[in-house]
């Protein structure tokens, strides 16, 4: 998530970078405990197999912190929008959700996120009454996720399209 979010310019990429580094420290401490303390060191080296830092098929020489990317936040709150299953980001313009069908009856998400510092308000509007949205308005400091589904009882048979607008 860190690298994807960094490519998208999300400020939350920095949270994931910190978390990766924290968990690497925890893993190192757990390995040391297992090797030196547990059962008086009886199992030393049993948990020392290299398991962090793989970037290709061959085994690295030692564990290493996975590469993380940090984002420099923009100086003002800036909205970014990304839909489930797509790396593309749009501050405005068109993005498409996956196709809905009444057999799976699943929902898809849209992330509204900040690329800068501060907060911004957003509103969600739909052009069709059968579009079911989990959140119609909100305030974003880092990110907010909305879920989009279909109320199949309000929809006529056949293929149809609807438009969802996200604006500040």
Which positions does each model-derived feature cover?
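Glycine-centered flexibility motif
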Residues: 40-44, 116-118, 138, 162
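Hydrophobic beta-strand core residues of beta-sandwich domains
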Residues: 100, 138-140, 155
């Amino acid at each position: 998530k860190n690298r994807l979010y960094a490519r998208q310019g999300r400020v939350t990429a920095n949270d994931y970078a910190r978390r990766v580094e924290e968990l690497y420290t925890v893993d190192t401490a757990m390995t040391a405990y297992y090797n030196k303390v547990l059962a008086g060191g009886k199992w030393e080296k049993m948990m020392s197999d290299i398991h962090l830092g793989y970037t290709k098929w061959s085994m690295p020489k030692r564990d290493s912190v996975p590469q993380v990317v940090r984002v420099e936040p923009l100086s003002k709150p800036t909205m970014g929008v990304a839909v489930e299953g797509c790396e593309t980001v749009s501050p405005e313009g068109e993005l498409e959700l996956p196709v809905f069908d009444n057999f799976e009856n699943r929902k898809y998400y849209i992330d509204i996120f900040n690329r800068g510092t501060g907060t911004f308000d957003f509103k969600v509007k739909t052009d069709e009454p059968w579009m079911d949205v989990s959140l119609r308005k909100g305030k974003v400091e880092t990110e907010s996720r909305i879920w989009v589904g279909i109320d199949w009882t309000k929809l006529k048979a056949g293929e149809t399209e609807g438009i969802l607008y996200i604006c500040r």
